[in-house]
Amino acid sequence: MNYNSELEIEFLGTGTSTGVPSIGCHCKVCRSKDKKDKRLRASAIVRYKGMNILIDCGPDFRQQILRASSDNLDALLLTHIHYDHVAGIDDLRPYSFNHIFPIYARPEVNQQLRTNLPYCFTKHPYPGVPRLDLVDIDNNPFMVGNVEVTPIPVMHDKLLINGYRIGPLAYITDCSYISPEEIEKLKGIPLLVINALRHRPHHSHMTVEQALEVVSQISPQVTYFTHMC
């Protein structure tokens, strides 16, 4: 989706952690034949100022990138370590054939990646494994090429995770709470992407109603919901 002449966001998936339909679920949505009720795990490509930035890389990544409008990628931003956001990282190997591929995440996320993918980070890695540069970030803005990225710390139940601001876009997923300080920083942003899991309460994700309340506080020009059942 083109927001303006500079920024484009392509949603690779907007589903919850199990995807939609969910295995073993026989609710109306999961039995639906409507293609709009088919959702892969939440991920997006942000194209801005010539850079192609992937946000999250879940278990559906290979399928998602093969059907994307372009498969060019320059970097990966991770929101957090949960499997539905990192399980596709091994499939980044084609992007590291010619250069080491950068991944930006909180230090605790990168440390867990080293534990989960030890074959990528040995002194003498096996030929063909992904060559990854794990870049630790804090709450300060950082550069991905010529693009400034600002972390947006939010809570996922009791887990501190990151949303990201890239130019006119803020992308927030898996959030259950955003502090007043972060809300203040986002007020008036042109384009907001935020999770809205369902109408029923959930301990670690915003409901549709809670997401709408955040939207009313931030007052973006355009809002898209993601990470939905």
Regions found by a protein language model. Give the residues of each.
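Cap/insert and terminal regions of metallo-dependent hydrolase folds
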Residues: Y177-C229
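Binuclear metal-dependent hydrolase catalytic cores
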Residues: M1-I172, E181
